[in-house]
Every structure is written in structure tokens, then in C-alpha cells.
């Protein structure tokens, strides 16, 4: 029986995406995230609060490596990368790293124990694909099986993106989802009434996972997934473009986004740590967008821009 090695990193919640990326880059076959915030305000089937969940700003990110991996080298690299992230101003917190071995069948399912149904916005709830869930009236359920390499939709950057989509979409829109990952934003757009959604990701694994998640949700055959490098080569105009990726990448797509967003349309940018906020704002303003909404959760920012000649009620330019 093949064994796997498990490394758990305890970091501040704001560092979730950056640290997950570090773990994948060091050879992890997947990550699982345990975050006490996912339980805040959640209730079980009988209306009772989840019991005795201690709330903390720290989260546990568990990565899984083949038994052949030199774990000492991996942990040394992880510590170096985490120190570098902290030097860039990202709030990492007091980092601790633990490791252990586990059997393959445990590795395959271990991450699922951290993943519970979560009400993300007023209307949207994300539910693991293996969980039975009875939706309430008006509740829109996103079935998701992100695999171990993608987030579960509960990170602040994803939450703010979903909130923005819920506020903007009224039905009949064309949406472009850049860096789709698990496909959660595309699925949400479909459930919120968008007519057609185009989802792009540079990673072939993400394209496959997104399509698998789309197939889990009924009525989402209006989502078209393809490999793509941001908006390069895209000619389809859209009412809304949404991108939840790193700030350094967001600034590379603002000009193409302005070309593709229809007049009175929206650009939603998320995944922005506070230190990178001005850089993203400058790129979007230079492209011609006006800022309509700025959302903040912890160290993370999400921005909603509008393409318009009527600047009443908007900021920037």
C-alpha cells in the first residue's frame, strides 16, 4: 500500500491563497483548508449552531506529498517562501509546520472532512457534491467538488466576487470568467440568470475540474470552458467580466477587459491584497474604467468597475 506524507501549515487567514500556491509549487498533490470562519453562523438541519468551534484568524492548510518526496527539503523551502511572503507585507502570522505519514485511501478523502455547506451570500450556498442538502425557498445551491488543488469557495476573495455578481446580474447577461479555477464564479453566474458564460483558465487541470463541477449543477449548459491566457485572443463582448486572481496578473488584463466590456458593463477584480491595491486601481483607471464599489475583508480587496461615460455615482478617472 502506497503511503503519503502530510504537511500542515498554520498561517493567518489572509495568507490562504498565497500559501496554498507555495505548497502546490513545492510538489503537493493537493491541499485542504480548515478554517473556523466557515462555521460562523452555520446551522445544522435542526437549527442548532455547530458546537464548540473556536474562532481564530489562523487557519490550517494541509498539503499531501508522495512518499518519495524529501520532506525535509520541502519544509525548508516552505519556510523560506513564507518568510518571503511576510517580507512583501502579506500577513502570515505565527507559522508552524507539522508533518506525518498516512495511507493512500486516507489521503484521497482526508481533505473532505473540512468541507461543509456554506451560505456565502444572501442567495448563494456552496455545497460539497457528496453531501445531501435541502435548499430553502429562493436559495441557489452551487454543487462543488473542487478536488484538492482548488479552493472550496469560502475564501474572502471568492465571497466578495460572488457578492458582486449577485448585486450586478439581473438576467440575460454575457459573463466572462477569467482564471475560472473550480468554476464556482461561472456556476454562480448561471444560477443568477446570466444567459451565456465563457470561462477561461491557463491551467488544463482547472479547465477539467471546472467542467466537472459545471456538470454537477443542472441548467449550466450555458457555460463554455476553454483553456486561455487571460483575455488574449478573446473577441466576445461581455456585460460582466470577473477575475479572482493575483493582483500582479489582474493588471495585465485591464486593457483587454475594457475592449471587451460593453458600455455600461462591469469589471469585477478580486484577489487583491492591500499592498497591491493602488497598482490595480491605476491599471483599471488607465484603461478607462470608473470605480463603483470597493469591498474589503481583512487584507483582501475586491473592486467593481464600470465602463460608462456617465460618471455620476462612480469614482475614479
UniProtKB/Swiss-Prot annotation:
Q: Where does the protein principally reside?
A: cytoplasm
The molecular function terms in GO held by this entry are: protein-lysine N-methyltransferase activity
Keywords associated with the record: Cytoplasm, Methyltransferase, S-adenosyl-L-methionine, Transferase
Q: Which GO terms describe its biological process?
A: methylation
UniProt binding sites for S-adenosyl-L-methionine:
158, 179, 201, 244
Its GO CC terms?
cytoplasm
Its UniProt entry gives the catalysed reaction(s) as:
L-lysyl-[protein] + 3 S-adenosyl-L-methionine = N(6),N(6),N(6)-trimethyl-L-lysyl-[protein] + 3 S-adenosyl-L-homocysteine + 3 H(+)
Subcellular compartments: Cytoplasm
Superkingdom of this protein's organism: Bacteria
User: What's the top EC group for this one?
Assistant: transferase
Q: Name one Pfam family in it.
A: PrmA
Briefly state the protein's biological role. Answer: Methylates ribosomal protein L11.
Q: What is this protein called?
A: Ribosomal protein L11 methyltransferase
- What organism does the UniProt record list as the source? Streptococcus pyogenes serotype M5 (strain Manfredo)
Give the lineage. Bacteria, Bacillati, Bacillota, Bacilli, Lactobacillales
What gene codes for this chain?
Answer: prmA
